[in-house]
Amino acid sequence: MKAFIAILSIAIVLLLIVSIKETSAKDCKQECVKRYTNGDLTNFLKAEYGPERRGGKCYCEFTCHVKFYIYLKHELN
């Protein structure tokens, strides 16, 4: 029974980590577009998310050679 509870808790933690990363990658793209073009996707090229402690670093790149980083903070409810 203890082994089952341990395996179940590990699975829940892994699921939480994956869901935070997916949400943060989506937030990364939205923040890039919102901060530079006020929601216009015309010049958007790519957004890459890298998880870090208590948040993540978001790399934004646009077709007009504009590149910058944004730091996203995880907020768990």
Curated annotation (Swiss-Prot):
PTM text: Contains 2 disulfide bonds.
Q: In which tissues is it expressed?
A: Expressed by the venom gland.
Region forming the signal peptide: 1-25
What keywords does the record list, in alphabetical order?
Disulfide bond, Neurotoxin, Secreted, Signal, Toxin
The name on file for this protein is Putative neurotoxin 3
From the UniProt record, which GO molecular function terms apply?
toxin activity
Write down the superkingdom of origin.
Eukaryota
One GO cellular component term noted in the UniProt record for this chain: extracellular region
Organism of origin is Scolopendra mutilans (Chinese red-headed centipede)
| Compartment list | Secreted
Q: Can you tell me which family this protein belongs to?
A: Belongs to the scolopendra neurotoxin 3 family.
- Propeptide feature: residues: 26-46
